[in-house]
Each structure stands twice: as C-alpha cells, then as structure tokens.
C-alpha cells in the first residue's frame, strides 16, 4: 500500500503498532498534562495530527480488527484525527478478506473524527495474494488489483483534498470547538 500511495504522489508515514511498542493502554495521550506527556506519545501525536488522511490496515482476528491497531488508536483522542478522511484496508486468511474487522473498525474511526470513505479494500486469502513484505505475488494480476484499489484511493484523495481546502477557508476547530473545561472533555473534537 505504501508504494502504491507514494506512486500517486503522497508522502506516507507508516505507524506499525507492533514496531511502536506502545504499552497496553492505561493512560491516553490527552489525559496527561502537556508537560507530562511521554516523548514517544508526543512525537506520534504530532505526526498523526499533521497528516491529511489516514489509511488503516488490519488483519482480522476473531471477526475483529487487530488489537494492536485498536490499542494504538486509543492512545490518542479525536482531536488528533478530526476533520480528515480515512480508508480501511483489511485482510484475512479466509474468503472474506477481513470484512468483519473492517466493519468493526468503521465506528472507531468515525468516533475519532477521521470519517472512513465508503469504499474499502479487502484482501481474502492474503497468504496466497501478497508476500510478507506486502508486494503482490507474481501469480496475481497487478492491473486487476490496481483497478480494485483505485476506487478507495480516489475517494480518499477526493475527501482529503476537499477537507484540506475547506480547512484553509474555515478552521474546523473554531467552527466546532473542543470541550476543554475539564480533563474528561479533552478528547472531544
């Protein structure tokens, strides 16, 4: 996915929840006072906050998204993700391509404020379709997959560009200010 998006002219930053090594969530980024936020969380929050759009990639575990991905998302509040589009890519070893995980991820992303585009990418029998590095196997018809990915990427680009342009006209955080009168409200967009 990274190479495909870069090929479309995008700068892509990968946040692999396993590589980041965040602990099981006990205290999210927004629950710390600004001077107490762990540096790692602050760096991730800064990178996520400055992104124009998000592509989440998840395997399906027990009909649900990756616990590591959900843990990563839950470390940050909606003010990190708000007013930007997202796309969902899912995969599984079975015939459904992680569809159930993708559907479960949709309301999580919506609550974070990075509304998912309607088109999703599902990769069934991923072990037969892609190599461990994420490239399509030689036995796969690359043009067929590119055609499938196009709808999702086009929607994400359209919404990303529209949100960015409108943000230049109207600051969404002023139009819809965050509730910040108490610590319990810090997460609200």
Regions picked out by a protein language model, each given a short descriptive name:
Residues 1-74, 137-150, 164-189:
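N-terminal beta1-alpha1-beta2 submodule of the flavodoxin-like/Rossmannoid cofactor-binding fold
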Residues 3-10, 110, 114, 128, ...:
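Generic secondary-structure signature for well-ordered alpha-helical cores
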Residues 13-24, 78, 114-135:
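Mobile beta-alpha loop/short-helix "lid" or hinge segments that flank ligand
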Residues 52-54, 84-87:
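Short, surface-exposed connector motifs at secondary-structure boundaries
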Residues 71-79, 107-111:
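A glycine- and small-aliphatic-rich helix-loop capping segment at beta-alpha/alpha-beta transitions
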Residues 85-128, 143-147:
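Short, glycine-/small-residue-rich phosphate/pyrophosphate-handling segment
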């Amino acid at each position: 996915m990274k190479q495909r998006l870069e090929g479309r002219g995008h700068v892509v930053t990968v946040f692999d929840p396993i590589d980041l090594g965040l602990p099981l969530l006990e205290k999210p980024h927004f629950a710390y006072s600004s001077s107490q936020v762990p540096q790692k969380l602050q760096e991730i929050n800064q990178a996520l906050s400055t992104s124009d759009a998000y592509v989440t990639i998840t395997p399906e575990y027990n009909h649900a998204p990756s616990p590591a991905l959900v843990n990563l998302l839950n470390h940050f509040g909606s003010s990190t993700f708000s007013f930007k589009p997202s796309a969902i890519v899912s995969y599984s070893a079975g015939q459904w391509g992680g569809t159930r995980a993708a559907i479960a991820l949709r309301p999580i992303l919506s609550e974070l404020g990075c509304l998912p585009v309607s088109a999703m990418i599902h990769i069934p029998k991923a072990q037969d379709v892609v190599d461990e590095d994420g490239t399509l196997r030689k036995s796969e018809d690359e043009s067929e997959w590119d055609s499938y990915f196009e709808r999702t990427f086009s929607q994400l680009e359209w919404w990303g560009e529209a949100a960015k342009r409108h943000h230049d006209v109207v600051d969404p955080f002023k139009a819809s200010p965050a509730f910040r009168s108490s610590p319990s409200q810090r997460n609200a967009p």
